[in-house]
Structure formats: structure tokens, C-alpha cells
């Protein structure tokens, strides 16, 4: 059998090794100059005024919700077809996640679904830029402005995604992920961008014990060695080891995403003759980052179920992923919201399958996946 082809693999090279070596030899390995450089680089990428690096996108979501003072009695609108961390953070703060349906073919939450879910208790809207494509963020922000509701963009899939000529996050507040399978990675990490100076100041405090400044700031700027605790906070800072890797990856972003796009195009051409349905692309002008390549496996149409397809691919040495099982079908949320029905979300949750997609894949690797799909479709 051929070597196992994983669903994803980080694209690491000598540059990342050199970046880590530099940090280790510098004597400053926790939050420091590499964090500052990463934040500045993201501001240049997105055009935002502020960037705050954190230990994970989940941490970023947690402190953003906290900074917006979301808590008991509040509602936050978000799709169910997302990773559960968003729902978990909303719930842990005592608020209620209001899960809405998505478009059947793009898997994007729609402005119409969001607006229909607004109540006097709605405190925030969290759209997801799904799989590397952008949601219709102008329309969603317009709803937020009309009702006076904050919009927090879940941009975990969207490093390198553009909407109408603007990088995701521009002129708003968005949270990116540097998890191991993301378009750029430092194993674990995240980053928040915003143009809201007050929000940025609160996020910096909340991510580091509620202190007004961190240790590197105190050393660099000659401040008093004992900083003041201004509010209870968390330990969500990113180390410079991680930041150095992320910064090196960011410099490669165009190359990494170009390779993802080439593989996605190879899949798209082959799938035109197969019953497996890829996601539709959004109608608005955009640049897709191709974080994921997702097909829908409908048993009646394809002659095989999604789970059987994933198992058959595994037997052929090909890994796959599931992004995502709908959050409202998970035990905790199913029991909390037993009557919730989201038809498009549920239909897709039972059929979606993520194919291998990462920059170090070869054309032959993609051909191997395509050949297996052709065999399993009976063609």
C-alpha cells in the first residue's frame, strides 16, 4: 500500500526551524518582540488598526465575548455548523447561543437567517467565514449596525480570504486561528484584529491576567516592575516561539494558498463528472483561501454513505475530515435545545466530508484521491 495520505499536514521547513532557533537563543522565549512583529504584520495584511495575538482562537473568542460584557440573559447568534468552541464560550459565560441555519450549498450563515433570529436580548452576531470562503459580511454588518449589535467574525478558516477586495477582518473585528491544520500554523495560536481601540485595550488586559502591560512591555519601556491588575484576566498570551513560527508562515502565505488553490482546482475539474457534490462558491467577489475542500456524499445520489466513503478511503490509505458535525446534534446542545430544527445544517452535517488538502500535496497525491473517488462512485 502507498504511504498514508493524511487529511492535513503542516508545511514546515528550514525557515521555521531557523525562526525557533533564533528565539531560543535570544533569551526571550515567551511573549515579546516576535508577538509584536506578528501583530504588526497582521495589521498590514488586513488593514486593521489593532491586532492582539493569543494562545488560540478559542481564547480570542472567550475574551472578545467578555470584553463585550456578554453574560447571563444575553443571546448570541451563530450557526450550528461550526466548531463547538464558539458555542461553548457563549454558554460558559452564561449567555444563550441562538443557532441559525446556513445556505444549503455554501454553508454560510445568511443575513436573512440572522435578522429573523434577533430579539431584544441579542448582544452579538458571530458569522463564520467557512472553509476559506467569505460570508456576506457587508450585509451582516449592516444588520448589526441597524440593530446596534456587535459583529464578531469567526475567521478561523480565513487567513488569506478576501471579500470584495478587502481581507477578511478589515474595518471590523475578526478572530483568526493558527491551529495545526490551518492555512498558517504555529501548532496552537490565534489572533484578533479590530479597529476599536477600547476593545483592543480590554483584550490586551484580559489575555494577560488583567494587567495593563505585559512583562515584555515593562522591560522594554522601563515601566515599574509591578504592573497594576485592572480587571480579572486569563493566561491567554502567545509565546514568542509560536509567534516566530506564525510570522514565518505568514511570509509564505501567498505561496501556501496558491498551492491549495491548485489542488482545489484539480479536485473541481475531476468532480464535475462524479456524483459527489462540492460546496458552491459565494456569488459576491472574493478570493478563496481554500482552507478546506468539502464534498457532500448523499447515499441515494452516490451509492455510498458518507461514513462508508470515509472508511473506504481510509482503507486505501487516504485520510479525510468532518467539518463539522452540527453543534446542536452534540449531546449537551441536543439536550439543551431538543426542539431545534435546522434543515440545511442537518442535511449537510450528515453528508459533508473534507478531502486531503495541504500545500505539500503533490499532483499525484490529488490524483490518488480522485482515482479512489472514481472507484467508489462506480465509475
Swiss-Prot record:
GO BP of this protein: lipid A biosynthetic process; lipopolysaccharide biosynthetic process; response to antibiotic
EC number: 2.6.1.87
GO CC annotation: membrane
Protein name: UDP-4-amino-4-deoxy-L-arabinose--oxoglutarate aminotransferase
Subunit structure: Homodimer.
Role this protein plays: Catalyzes the conversion of UDP-4-keto-arabinose (UDP-Ara4O) to UDP-4-amino-4-deoxy-L-arabinose (UDP-L-Ara4N). The modified arabinose is attached to lipid A and is required for resistance to polymyxin and cationic antimicrobial peptides.
Alphabetized Pfam families for the sequence: DegT_DnrJ_EryC1
Enzyme class, UniProt record, top EC level: transferase
The organism's place on the tree of life at top rank: Bacteria
Record GO terms (molecular function): pyridoxal phosphate binding; UDP-4-amino-4-deoxy-L-arabinose aminotransferase
HAMAP family: ArnB_transfer
Residues in coiled coil: none
Modified residues (N6-(pyridoxal phosphate)lysine): 182
Cysteine pairings via disulfide bonds: none
Catalysed reaction, written as an equation: UDP-4-amino-4-deoxy-beta-L-arabinose + 2-oxoglutarate = UDP-beta-L-threo-pentopyranos-4-ulose + L-glutamate
Pathway assigned to this chain's UniProt record: Nucleotide-sugar biosynthesis; UDP-4-deoxy-4-formamido-beta-L-arabinose biosynthesis; UDP-4-deoxy-4-formamido-beta-L-arabinose from UDP-alpha-D-glucuronate: step 2/3; Bacterial outer membrane biogenesis; lipopolysaccharide biosynthesis
Keyword vocabulary terms for this entry: Aminotransferase, Antibiotic resistance, Lipid A biosynthesis, Lipid biosynthesis, Lipid metabolism, Lipopolysaccharide biosynthesis, Pyridoxal phosphate, Transferase
Requisite cofactors: pyridoxal 5'-phosphate
UniProt keyword Glycoprotein present: no
Presence of keyword Lipid metabolism: yes
Amino acid at each position: 500500500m502507498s504511504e498514508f495520505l493524511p487529511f492535513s499536514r503542516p508545511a514546515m521547513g528550514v525557515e521555521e526551524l531557523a525562526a525557533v532557533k533564533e528565539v531560543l537563543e535570544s533569551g526571550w522565549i515567551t511573549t515579546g518582540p516576535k508577538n509584536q512583529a506578528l501583530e504588526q504584520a497582521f495589521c498590514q495584511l488586513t488593514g486593521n488598526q489593532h491586532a492582539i495575538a493569543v494562545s488560540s482562537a478559542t481564547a480570542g473568542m472567550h475574551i472578545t465575548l467578555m470584553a463585550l460584557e456578554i453574560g447571563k440573559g444575553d443571546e448570541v447568534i451563530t450557526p450550528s455548523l461550526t466548531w463547538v468552541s464558539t458555542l461553548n464560550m457563549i454558554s460558559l459565560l452564561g449567555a444563550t447561543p441562538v443557532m441559525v441555519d446556513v445556505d444549503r450549498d455554501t454553508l454560510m450563515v445568511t443575513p436573512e437567517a440572522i435578522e429573523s433570529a434577533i430579539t431584544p436580548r441579542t448582544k452579538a452576531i458571530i458569522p463564520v467565514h467557512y472553509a476559506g470562503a467569505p460570508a456576506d459580511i457587508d450585509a451582516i454588518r449592516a444588520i448589526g449596525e441597524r440593530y446596534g449589535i456587535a459583529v464578531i467574525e469567526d475567521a478561523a478558516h480565513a487567513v488569506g480570504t478576501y471579500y470584495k477586495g478587502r481581507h477578511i477582518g478589515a474595518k471590523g473585528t475578526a478572530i483568526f486561528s493558527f491551529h495545526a491544520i490551518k492555512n498558517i500554523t504555529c501548532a496552537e495560536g490565534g489572533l484578533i484584529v479590530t479597529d476599536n481601540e477600547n476593545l483592543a485595550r480590554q483584550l490586551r488586559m484580559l489575555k494577560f491576567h488583567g494587567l495593563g502591560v505585559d512583562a515584555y512591555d515593562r522591560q522594554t519601556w522601563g515601566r515599574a516592575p509591578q504592573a497594576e491588575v485592572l480587571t480579572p484576566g486569563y493566561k491567554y498570551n502567545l509565546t514568542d516561539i509560536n509567534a516566530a513560527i506564525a510570522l514565518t508562515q505568514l511570509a509564505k502565505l501567498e505561496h501556501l494558498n496558491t498551492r491549495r488553490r491548485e489542488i482545489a482546482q484539480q479536485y473541481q475539474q475531476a468532480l464535475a463528472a462524479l456524483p459527489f457534490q462540492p460546496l458552491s462558491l459565494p456569488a459576491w467577489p472574493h478570493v478563496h483561501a481554500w482552507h478546506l475542500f468539502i464534498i457532500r456524499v448523499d447515499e441515494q445520489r452516490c451509492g455510498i454513505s458518507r461514513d462508508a466513503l470515509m472508511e473506504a478511503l481510509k482503507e486505501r490509505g487516504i485520510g479525510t475530515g468532518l467539518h463539522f458535525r452540527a453543534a446542536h446534534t452534540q449531546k449537551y446542545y441536543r439536550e439543551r435545545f431538543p426542539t431545534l430544527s435546522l434543515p440545511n445544517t442537518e442535511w449537510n452535517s450528515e453528508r459533508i466530508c473534507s478531502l486531503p488538502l495541504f500545500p505539500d500535496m503533490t499532483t499525484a497525491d490529488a490524483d490518488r484521491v480522485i482515482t479512489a473517488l472514481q472507484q467508489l462512485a462506480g465509475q
